Amino acid sequence: MTQRTVNIYLVPTKELAQQVSFQLEPHACIETEYGDWALEGTMFTANHHLPKYAGYPAPCMTPINLTNWCLPMGANIIISHIDLDTVLGVMGLLGEWYFIPLEFREVAEFIDTNGPHHIHKFPAHVQDWFNAYWAWSALPENRALRVTEITDVTATIHKYIQFFELLFDLYAHNSPPLIEEGRVWASNIQCETESKLLMETENYRVFRTDRVFCGASYYSPTHKTIAKVVISFNTNFNSITVSCSDGSLDCRALVQRLWGPTAGGHKGIAGSPRGKIVDEYELKRAVYTIKLMAIRPNLYMCPAYTGECYWDFNCYQDYCPAYRKCIESVFEWGGTIKMLPTGELKLL
C-alpha cells in the first residue's frame, strides 16, 4: 500500500463528524460511532456498536469482496479513533489481510467486544501475538493520537501495517524479537498496573493511570479474587473507562447515564465521550454511581437528601442541591454504602 492511495482521516467527535461531509466525501467509514449517533460512508460502512448494527461483525471481521469492488484512487476513509479493530478494518478495506492470520482477527473481534482481560483464554501463540502488539503500541512513538480536529492519519495507519508485516514475518525474520519483547512487556505490566491502584473492594477496583491500560486488571492480589468491575481514570487522555468481568453491569448504559448519549462502547467495556475532558470528580461520581447501582439496580436514593428520587444522573445540575455534599461524602476512598433494613442508604 502506498501512503497516498487513499486518505485516512481521524474525526474524533460527533460535532466534527456531522460537519465532515462539507469538507470531504466520506467514501468509507470504520468505527465511526459517537455514542448514539453514527456517520456512514457513501460506499462502505463498518460499525458494530449501536443497536441498529446489532449482529454486525467488528470491522476486523467485516466481509469485504475486493474482487468485485474497491475504493477509487484518492478515496477518503473516516475513523473515529485508532485501535486494533479499527486498524484491521482499514487493512481489510485496502486488501492487506492476506498476511494476517484469521485467528488473530477473530480474537481481535472478541477482545474488542468483551475486553482484553479475556486474552488468557486463548492459546499461548495468540497471547504472544497480542502482547507483541500491545508492547509495540505502548511505545511513546506509537501511542494512539489524541486529536481535537479532523486529522490526516494515513501515515500513522501505514506504520501499523508495517508493524504487522514484521510481526507475521512477511518480509524478514523479525517476529521472534517482537514476540520476546511482548513477553517481557506482559511480565512487567502487571506490576505497573498494580502501582496505579487507588482503591479496591472485593467487587470493584479503581485505578488512576497515565499510559498503562488498567481496564483488564480484575484480579486482586490482596483479596485473591476477581473483581466484577474496573473503573480506570486515564490522566493522559482525561478519560474514564468502565469494564465488567461477568456481565453483571451494562457498562455502556452506565457511561451514557453518567455522561449522556455521546458516551459509548459495549456492555462489557465502555468509556466517557471522545473529546470530553473528565477529571477526578467524575471518577468519584462514577465510583459512587456503581456503589448505588450495586445496591439498587433501578431505584436510587440520595443519602444526603430526605426522601426518594429516581436519579437521572443529571440531578446534581438540575434538581438536587444536596448532590455535591452527597458525592463529597464518598470522596474518602475507603467509604462504603450500606442499605439499612428501612431501605435507607447510609454512608459508612
Language model segments and positions:
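Exposed alpha-helical structural elements
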Residues: 106-109, 118-121, 125, 162, ...
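Hydrophobic, aromatic-enriched interface-forming segments
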Residues: 122-197
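Conserved catalytic core of nucleotide polymerization and phosphodiester-bond processing enzymes
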Residues: 1
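Short alpha-helices
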Residues: 49-154
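Short hydrophobic beta-strand segments
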Residues: 4-10, 25-31, 72-81, 206-208
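Gly/His-enriched, cation/cofactor- and phosphate-binding structural elements
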Residues: 17-42, 48, 166-348
